[in-house]
Amino acid sequence: VVVCSGRQFVSEKKLFSPIRDELLYITDGGTVVRTPNKILQVSTMPEEVWKGMCQMVHEHLPDCDSYISTPDMGYAENENSQMFRWLRNSYGYDICAVKDLIACSPADVIKFTVYHPSACEEKCAPVFTPAWKDQALLASSGREWIDCNPLGVSKWTALSYLQNYLGVLPEETCTFGDNLNDMEMLENAGLSFAVSNSREEVRNAAKEICPPYWENGVLQ
């Protein structure tokens, strides 16, 4: 069983605490692949790309917030912001406040994320998305988030790596998803389920539909 999420490793482990040592992990939207004890693969983002994204958010998206991810830590500028508190207190992230995100410059940035409390995709559409869609893989993750991965790196590419690592064929793989960043994974797995409360594009990408999360559709 593989946990595959946009979340940080520490957050995924907390969610699956009773069986955390029995799982494999795809974290941060496919940029990191792990066993419970070691990293198998990391995909990093060019510094000029994530710094350019950060500068654009500062200059053109004043209503939005952002953070960067490394394999084991997140970095954001305002520890009192709604985004920071949500990541730290609700998702259980290891996240550090820094004065200037661009000046922070950790060596292994794997993902840049834009946040807006209700309409991130719409806020990014006029300027941010056209500017970066050919330099990174951009995907909406709910109404609050736009995740920006290194170009060509997704949940599906991470899962493909694990299939090769374990000797498992795509037709032997079953995936579940609910957001746009799950679509490639849903389209390519031998069997796939979208929860019924997901967006129409996501439901169309899956081979089957399962009940919504509030009915524990995946567990059913």
PLM-predicted stretches and their roles:
Residues 22, 109-110, 189, 206:
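Short, well-ordered alpha-helix to beta-strand connector turns
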Residues 188, 192, 196-220:
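Asp-based, Mg2+/Mn2+-dependent phosphohydrolase catalytic module
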Residues 12-16, 124, 128, 186, ...:
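Hydrophobic packing residues within well-ordered alpha-helices of enzyme cores
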Residues 29, 112, 186, 207:
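Residue-level signal for inorganic ion chemistry
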Residues 2, 26, 174-176, 193, ...:
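Hydrophobic/aromatic beta-strand patches that form the interior of the parallel beta-sheet core
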Residues 56, 63-176, 180-185, 197:
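Conserved acidic, metal-coordinating active-site core of Asp-based
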Residues 1-84:
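Active-site phosphate-binding/coordination module
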